Amino acid sequence: FFQSTKGYGVFWDNYSPTLFTDNEVETSFRSEVGDCVDYYFMYGKNADGVIAQVRNLTGQAPMFPLWTYGYWQSKERYKSQEEVVDVVRKYRELGIPLDGIIQDWQYWGHNYLWNAMDFQNPTFNNPQKMMEDVHAMNAHMAISIWSSFGPMTKPYRELDKKGMLFNFTTWPQSGLESWPPNMEYPSGVRVYDAYNPEARDIYWKYLNDGIFKLGMDAWWMDSTEPD
C-alpha cells in the first residue's frame, strides 16, 4: 500500500514477493508471481479520505482513549505509592502536561510473590487511595503484569493444582534479589497455560479482583514471550 499527497492510495493485493519502486520517474509495484493484477485504487481527495476508504476495506479499527496519545512518565520502577503520587503532583505543580504514569514490577513484593496480581509490597499499603489520588489529578495509570507466577501466589497455587503451569525455567531465575542470580535459591516462577480457556478465566479472576477493580486504567503486558 502507498498513499500519495495527491489524495489517492493504492493497495497492491498480491501474496508473492513484490518490488515497490518510487523515484522521480515512476511509482510502481511488480510481483514475481500472479494470475492477474489485483489491486485497489482509493481516491479520497485528501489523506483522511484515503484512510477512510482503507478502513472501509479492512474494517473499522477502534481508537484508543484520547489520553493514551499524551505524555507518559515511567522509569525502572516506583518503589512506593507515595512516590507514584508525588511524581504526578510534581508534574501538575510545574504545569507540564502529563496523561499517564506506569508502575513497573515489584509492587507485589519479593520474587516468590512474582506477579501476585496484588499489592503485597508494604510500600503500597493502600493502592485504592493511590488510584484515587492519581485520578483526582486528572492522570491515568498503567501497571506491569506478567504471564508467570511465583510459587507463593494464589494464582500459582490454583493453576498448579489444575496442571495449568508450564514446566520450564523462566525469569527471574532466583528467589533472591541479587545479581548475578543465586541459583541455590531458585525462584520457582512458572508460566501459565494461556491456551487453556479455564486458565485464562483464573488469570482474569485474580487480575480483576487484585488490580482492575481498584480503577487501574491500562495494562503493560510484560514478557508476553516468556524470558
Feature roles, as predicted:
Residues 1-227:
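Catalytic-domain carbohydrate-binding cleft regions of carbohydrate-active enzymes
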